[in-house]
Amino acid sequence: MDEIIKANELHASRIIDSTTSLREGDIAVSSGRRSKVCFARSCLWNKSVDGRVYIAYRLSTEYTEMETKLIKKGMENVEKGTCVRFVPRTHQEDYIDIQAKSGCWSYLGARGGRQTVSLQSPDCLQVGVISHELMHALGFVHEQSRFDRDSYVTVMWPNIWRDRLRNFEKFRTDNLDLPYDYGSIMHYGMYAYSQDGEPTIVPKNSNTKDIKLGQTTSLSHIDKLKINKLYNCGDMDDN
């Protein structure tokens, strides 16, 4: 998440266009559609009869061959151990359109029709960043947005940029009966939006003081469990 914050503070306005803005730093929200409804199961991608969730995508022709390979590695991160499969779009009406726009961001969950995922080159073309934005497209918010997060972390409000305080709001999320995941690829880092170099989020329990918040490379085991539970896939192999 630190890489996303850095890229978006440099390149992406919090206002994408006249009807869309960014919430929590990288979640696109349209004024005509409240993204909170996507915390429910109404914004899921359809599951196929074979038990997998096939998500069609289209890649911008602006990406180089190497950049395309990185994006596909980010997809493979999400696919491994889950029922999700990303497939090149042919005729599908619902699909993600991956574009090299300004900053790194995605809409939350399936919206129907074409929906943009922005992966600006080169700042957003890191495998972990790509996987993070695809997780938003699957319907997942940031881990520290969980309604029960105050039992696990302390938000250090005085250390946060004043105009970014709303990025630390809590929401009535469906936690899928899974534990709080300090190592989720969807968790803010300890210094996210720090105005003075001091931590903005710290683990609450003494035995978790040395735990690193978030990660930048791959999904955690719990991230994968979340996908399979949200989409009712059961246990999936890594093929």
What does each model-identified segment do?
Residues 1-239:
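Zinc-dependent metalloendopeptidases
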